[in-house]
């Protein structure tokens, strides 16, 4: 699995990403809710378009 940094505006709606040590689900062009940690699941926040996020790319074994 490879990770890369991307601006929030480039994360597709419906995609998961990481920011600030939490795992998030992008709900709209400006909002996302926490998936992990579980005790904060469902709490949502506004993000700036240029806020940095980490995305993970699944790679096939041997590539």
Describe each region flagged by the PLM.
Residues 1-12:
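Mixed-charge, Lys/Arg-rich low-complexity intrinsically disordered regions
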Residues 1-2, 59-63:
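Short intrinsically disordered terminal tails
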Residues 17-60:
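Acidic, low-complexity, intrinsically disordered interaction modules
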